[in-house]
């Protein structure tokens, strides 16, 4: 079995650690990273923050610029309940109902788990579209069957027209970021002894976008890759 491709030391966690270190003594200030990072990376950043005399609350989000502008991001916080309660009013500016999911590391794990679904759902929907089109099934007929079923996910309609038109510009979340997060998930899964080999093919497919114009485009550009053999 070939080894899993994984990611360590994400740019988000490395940059955040450098910024926190440069601040020096924190005097009970609270560090709230909101990007995607590994569980161990977040825990290490929490320990660093505490050594510098600060408090730590990881608060990664699901959503992008439109949700940020309307205060409807989904916030999944990890850290002490007391720190979460202290920062709730701030988080309420970004999310209608920010949630504390557990201690430090749990927010990071939740975010990675959700972003894995972005890759999995986009890939599976793209393959299904490719197959029914090759078989001559009208796309709308396929969607009429899919939409009322338990298999439907709203992201399918959100990305359908982009996939059909091959229009991947103006991204809210890029292909390169999706690849980075999927590799991060694979690393966390390996650390936990989970069997995630089935996702390796998706990661390999996303690697094909590296150093191409697809890398900075919307992540549904994955559809352009499923049409290649």
Describe the predicted segments one by one.
Residues 1-30, 37-40, 76:
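Rossmann-like NAD(P)-binding element
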Residues 3-9, 15, 77-83, 159-165, ...:
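Short, structured secondary-structure boundary patches
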Residues 6, 30, 35-116:
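Rossmann-fold dinucleotide-binding core
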Residues 7-18, 96-101, 152-155:
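Short, composition-biased local secondary-structure segments
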Residues 20-24, 46, 50, 88, ...:
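A structural alpha-helix within SAM-dependent methyltransferase catalytic domains
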Residues 26, 51, 93-95, 134, ...:
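Short, well-ordered coil/turn elements that cap or connect secondary structure elements
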Residues 82-92, 168-170, 223-229:
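Short, basic, helix/turn surface patches
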Residues 106-226:
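Helical "substrate-binding/catalytic lid" subdomain
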């Amino acid at each position: 079995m070939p080894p899993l491709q994984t990611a360590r030391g994400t740019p988000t966690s490395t940059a955040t650690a450098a910024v926190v270190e440069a601040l020096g003594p924190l005097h009970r200030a609270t560090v709230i990273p909101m990007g995607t990072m590994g569980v161990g990376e977040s825990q290490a950043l929490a320990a660093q923050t505490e050594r510098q005399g600060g408090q730590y609350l990881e608060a990664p989000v699901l959503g992008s610029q439109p949700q940020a502008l309307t205060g409807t991001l989904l916030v999944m916080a990890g850290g002490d309940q007391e720190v979460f309660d202290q920062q709730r009013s701030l988080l309420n500016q970004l999310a209608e109902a920010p949630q504390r999911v557990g201690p430090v590391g749990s927010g990071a794990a939740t975010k990675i788990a959700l972003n894995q679904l972005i890759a999995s759902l986009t890939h599976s929907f793209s393959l299904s579209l490719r197959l029914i089109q090759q078989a001559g099934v009208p796309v709308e007929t396929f969607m009429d069957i899919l939409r009322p079923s338990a298999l439907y996910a709203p992201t399918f309609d959100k990305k359908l027209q982009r996939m059909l038109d091959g229009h991947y510009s103006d991204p809210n979340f890029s292909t390169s970021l999706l690849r980075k997060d999927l590799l991060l998930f694979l690393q966390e899964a390996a650390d936990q002894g989970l069997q995630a080999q089935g996702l390796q093919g998706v990661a390999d497919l996303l690697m094909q976008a590296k150093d191409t114009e697809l890398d900075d485009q919307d992540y549904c550009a994955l559809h352009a890759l499923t049409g290649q053999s």
